[in-house]
């Protein structure tokens, strides 16, 4: 039996059942990776200070940070691919949505035509219909307000 305290929304949605984090490197290495991956101007001192502050604070509000996190997510999760909507899902895939807030991110799973999620150490729950508004592009629940990043996750091979 899985201990639900050992995984968060990312571990649940990606079905790794581990605690998921975006920032996995030392701060200075993470900042360097962001500038290299996104080909940002290293001489833009304002941008550099903003990115350093975001990484050191664990923030995600800067669009460059969000883009970097999505790129890293796709690199770390080979069974994941970006999609525009859930009509693109294949038979062996389920949907994953990701949004960012100021200092947090949240994943939602779309499987068998139902949305579900897991908050921190709480148990996963199916989302009520009225909560589906979070998944609308203009929806803003005051916590997660970024663009919605949608993905198709290929189910694990059962050998």
Indicate where each model-derived feature is located.
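Active-site or metal-binding loop neighborhoods of secreted/extracellular toxin and effector enzymes
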Residues: 114-159
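Active-site nucleophilic cysteine motif
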Residues: 2-21, 25, 62-67, 104
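Generic structural signal for residues positioned in beta-strands
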Residues: 11-12, 95-96, 114, 149-150
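Residues that form generic nucleotide/phosphate-binding pockets
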Residues: 12, 16, 37, 72-77
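Amphipathic alpha-helical interface segments
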Residues: 27-51
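Eukaryotic N-terminal accessory cofactor-binding modules
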Residues: 37-40, 58, 154-156
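...with weaker cross-activation on analogous glycine-rich loops/strands in unrelated enzymes
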Residues: 42-122
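Surface-exposed patches in mature extracellular/periplasmic domains of secreted proteins
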Residues: 21-31, 83-89
